[in-house]
UniProtKB/Swiss-Prot annotation:
Pfam families: SYY_C-terminal (PF22421), tRNA-synt_1b (PF00579). GO terms for cellular component: cytosol. It is found in: Cytoplasm. This is Tyrosine--tRNA ligase. Catalyzes the attachment of tyrosine to tRNA(Tyr) in a two-step reaction: tyrosine is first activated by ATP to form Tyr-AMP and then transferred to the acceptor end of tRNA(Tyr). ATP binds at residue 230. It comes from the Bacteria. The keyword Nucleotide-binding applies.
Length: 406
């Protein structure tokens, strides 16, 4: 099975610029392709996993990925899929974020000699001469055509800054630079990047007289069309300091029944026969498929050891087996005895704010050792400490252990 057939079967592909040509190209040659990642945060998140998995599938088939870190484009901010302008970051923040992205990418992509390339578009964008850029690149873009792009259409009513309007030119120029430097003939990205990718394909044709290609992927959404990887707390991050491996595991363990097969196909390397078998499970049996999904995605992102720990923690809490030591734990001192539960949990970062803690108690959603906390002013009592620990539960499924130091 060709890599294109694999990507189609698993449900990655949204659009392609030249489907038949791409099919022949990927079968006959080993190509260089790229995907861009603007380092606008200090960690990759679940939404990036589709691009990462596609790169990994392509690399396994012998093609060479370029991971392009947007050290230059992040200074502008991509308006695609945005209803408002992104917060402007400093160059120092972007450089720090790019370094974090780089380390995370190495978990998924083999960067050994000749296998893959890591680049940063700051290398060529930051030194551009504005007049020369307009004469050399800007001349090939018509404003009429640019305004037809979905990314700009959705922003015209609310206001699109000239800064953001330049983003398409910058991304197209990236593709041209990578074509010239590395013979990169294909750009891939999320489906919200379609207009920007086409702009790059056309720029290469106009400047070099050569054919380049584009491919976009589906966005990671639930069966209800909502973005996957978002919770009440915010994004599900790939950095274990921002989202613990246990929280990460639990997110996948608790996704909707209708989303299990899609997530298994897109976010694991399990054979499709197994994916389909797991996807056919119903009622209580679907929980087995969710456990497989949670373990496989956690293993991919955090490694097998952390995935096993998360699995054991979940078993300890929800099935009465396993080991409590793997449940997310926070050390606290003995002087918590007699203090308000809300204050202690806020200081231990179990709740984001004291008002959120009070709201949780009023709604009957906070438990200490599986006993509901009834009063917002309730204090920690000595008898709550069992074997030097207090088990805290928020809602139905979020657990934390407070380890009381002697």
């Amino acid at each position: 099975m060709s890599v294109l057939e694999v990507l189609k079967e698993r449900g990655y592909i949204a659009q392609m610029t030249h489907e038949e040509e791409i099919e022949k190209l990927l079968e006959k040659e080993k190509i260089t392709f790229y995907i861009g990642f603007d380092p606008t945060a200090d960690s990759l998140h679940v939404g990036h996993l589709i691009q990462i998995m596609t790169m990994a599938h392509m690399q396994r088939a012998g093609h060479r990925p370029i991971v392009l870190l947007g050290g230059g484009t992040a200074l502008i901010g991509d308006p695609s899929g945005r209803t408002d302008m992104r917060k402007m970051l400093t160059k120092e923040e972007i450089d720090r974020n790019a370094e974090a992205f780089k380390k995370q990418m190495e978990r998924f992509i083999d960067f050994s000699e000749g296998k893959a390339i890591m680049e940063n578009n700051a290398k060529w964008l930051l030194g551009l001469n504005y007049i020369e850029f307009l004469r050399d690149i800007g001349v090939h873009f018509t404003v009429n055509r640019m305004l037809e792009a979905e990314a700009f259409k959705t922003r015209m009513e609310r206001g699109l800054t000239f800064l953001e309007f330049n983003y398409m030119l910058m991304q197209a120029y990236d593709f041209l630079e990578l074509y010239r430097r590395y013979g990169c003939v294909m750009q891939m990205g999320g489906n919200d990047q379609w207009s920007n990718i086409i702009a790059g394909v056309e720029l290469i044709r106009k400047k070099e007289g050569k054919q380049a290609y584009g491919m976009t992927f589906v966005l990671l959404t639930t069966s209800e069309g909502k973005k996957m990887g978002k919770t009440e707390k915010g994004a599900i991050w790939l950095d274990p300091k921002k989202t613990s491996p246990y929280e990460f595991y639990q997110y996948w363990r608790n996704i909707g029944d209708a989303d299990v097969e899609k997530a298994l196909a897109l976010l694991t390397f399990l054979p499709m026969d197994e994916v389909r078998r797991l996807g056919r499970l119903r009622d209580k049996e679907i929980n087995e498929a969710k456990k497989v999904l949670a373990f496989e995605v956690t293993k991919l992102v955090h490694g097998e050891e952390e995935a096993l720990k998360a699995q054991k923690a979940a078993e300890a809490l929800f099935e009465g087996g396993g080991e409590m030591e793997h449940v997310p734990s926070i050390e606290v001192s003995q002087d918590i005895i007699g203090r308000k539960i809300v204050d202690v949990l806020f200081e231990a970062k179990v709740i984001p704010s004291k008002s959120e803690g009070r709201r949780l108690i009023q709604q009957g959603g906070l438990y200490i050792n599986d006993k509901r906390v009834e009063n917002v002013d309730e204090c920690i009592k000595e008898e709550m400490v069992k074997e030097n620990a207090i088990l805290v539960r928020k809602g139905k499924k979020e657990y934390h252990r407070l380890l009381v130091k002697e």
